[in-house]
């Protein structure tokens, strides 16, 4: 668990004790001192790009971030996602002649510090050249696929069809989330989803800790996710379904108030008032 989560629970417990008259509240609050010795220096980040399929103007994007949290080995978040991009690309190369739309495989740099790689791609590519985006993040903790659809129903339907075809578990969520590289595209109305996995672990599990190591992963989980994601991307790239773009205004108006506050507080709100 991350230290912040533990501290918040301690503070909440102290507050509860004080409210119930079973403790002093303030007296029970933990006192924390932190001494930080670090430096931030300019550096260069890159996106790695490959393509499969015909040379069409429009492309289906399959993406993941290649960086990890600064204290983490990053096996599941997001080494597994980057490996999946390569594996799905390999599988699609075997049926390249079937594809009607080019598939662009991208591993973004600098996700953990602000989605910089994804923003660069979104800002330097005309919207009409991006059919849709499937972003892989933390997708190897189990064989239970979860897709955050951000309200793009056409993309949700494709993953539901794939899950039915393979008799595979699937959960979906409609909430528009600014967490993950897909957000750089979603905010512009480009259809984009985040594919991950769920497990019995709470929260992000080992993510963002030193314990996010390769020994926690199971190659069978990776194989299952590669199969499902390949089937979905294949459907997008063969024209079986069209993922409809939305206006920036419709995206803006559908964002939950909590995320609106978060984005504005962090200086990341992308819309004019």
Identify the residue ranges that each predicted region occupies.
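Structural recognition of the beta-strand scaffold that forms the well-ordered cores
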Residues: 49-51, 60-63, 104-107, 131-136, ...
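Hydrophobic residues within well-ordered alpha-helices
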Residues: 19, 85, 185-186
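Active-site-adjacent substrate-binding region
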Residues: 2-12, 141-272
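Solvent-exposed loop/turn segments at secondary-structure junctions
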Residues: 3, 39-41, 54-56, 66-70, ...
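Soluble metallo-hydrolase cores and metallopeptidase-like ectodomains found primarily
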Residues: 1-75, 90, 94-102
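Acidic/histidine-rich catalytic neighborhood of metal-dependent amide-processing enzymes
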Residues: 44-47, 68-154, 244
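Extracytoplasmic/periplasmic mature domains of Sec-exported, cell-envelope-associated bacterial proteins
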Residues: 28, 32-34, 39-40, 75-79, ...
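Conserved beta-strand termini and adjacent loop/short-helix elements that scaffold enzyme active sites
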Residues: 35-37, 108, 173-175
